[in-house]
Amino acid sequence: MKRGVCILWMVMAWLQMVCAGEWQWAVTLKGFVSDETKKEPEAFLWVPAHCERLSAVMWSQQNMTEEMLFDMPSFRDSLAEMGVGLIWIAPGIDQQWDVRKGTQKVFDQMVNDLAEVSGYTELREVPLIPFGHSAMATFPWNFAAWNPERTLAVVSFHGDAPRTNLCGYGRENLEWGRTRNIDGIPSLMIEGEYEWWEARVNPALAFRMMYPESCISFLCDTGRGHFDVSEQTARYISRFIRKALEQRLPADGGKTLKKVNLAAGWLVQRWSPDERTRRATPAPVARYKGDVHDAFWYFDREMAELTEQRYKEHKLKKMQYLGICQQGKRVDYNPKLHAGVLLKFLPEEDGLTFHLNACFTDSLRQEMTDEHAAGKIRLERICGPVEQVDDTTFTVRFYRMGMYNPRRTSDIWLLASHPGDKHYK
């Protein structure tokens, strides 16, 4: 994974978790015991205020940036406009979505239970949008393959292609068999620029050729890495969901989702790290003049141009590199660490509050530098038992995840990022 520019990840190994967005209802899952807690997981439901009936539900399992996206106020505002709710399961129940283990039965019972406790009875049959990041980015594809009649759309974030041989969880993928597919289900794969790996993208292109009725869209999350969700990318995801609702919900209010009309879509050439390469012009499927084997499908002109504009925004700009300072000293960067920087927990006298600052560094991350874009570096929470007090102050806060998950309550993950300018990424 390539690290650089305006992204840095930090893990603080020590204690436990964060206060976040409102979730109005919760149920305990039946028929499954988590290896992480030795207890049944919990499922949390958020429904937009004043929503009388849900049009769809986006859902995920606990991992990392799922929380970051689902708690983002602007993203929730967009979902509220569409009548889309959220479900978050913690701990997760299956990275693969192997129905032979009873995973589907556990999920179906959970949805029924949430319908009962919330009063939103449509949850039993409402269209679903599986979302997953990294080690949880494979299951959305498999969930859709086993639930095509209920899957409105798929989003695999900083993760995997459908039927990939490089699963984020590091083991084998599930076999779909000869007849299972996700034809007509709009699906979005997102990969960050600073985690770019051709071997992750190529299976998505191959899948499009193997399944010509599939609707696979792709976004290179330019200027971003593996562990973050920018508001810009969140807006792209919400726009993708809006298009799926517009094109798939039946006009007569029926239950059967419509398949997307592939021929009415657009094609856009996939992103390449070689930004000097001349790109084919985005165009409707029938009029695209580029190599169709090297392009992805998009709903319409708006999504195609939104994608292409994102690539132009960061094209040929200079890199920025970030560092973290703790108690006035720059903390060493370790390229071998998945997180990049490992911090000590150095709280104030209350044992909870701690302070961090970010700085610009040279490309080796050894010295501070003045060669960078204007503006402040932003520090924010990814996941873990922490609440952000101000730009540089954080405090330990336990939240809905609880206090008794050794794996999840021992880490705090934070992100440092900078938006760049017309010269810098």
Give, region by region, the residue ranges found by the protein language model.
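Structural recognition of the beta-strand scaffold that forms the well-ordered cores
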Residues: 57-61, 85-90, 127-132, 152-158, ...
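Alpha/beta-hydrolase active-site loop
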Residues: 97-122
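Bacterial N-terminal signal peptides
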Residues: 7-16
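Alpha/beta-hydrolase-fold serine-hydrolase catalytic core, especially in secreted/extracellular enzymes
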Residues: 222-380
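The feature captures the conserved acid-bearing segment of alpha/beta-hydrolase catalytic domains
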Residues: 153-238
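A domain-start/cap signature at the N-terminus of enzymes
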Residues: 18-57, 128-143, 147, 151, ...
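Positively charged n-region of N-terminal signal peptides that target proteins for export
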Residues: 1-4
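Short substrate-entry loop that stabilizes the transition state in hydrolases
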Residues: 50-98, 163-164, 197-199
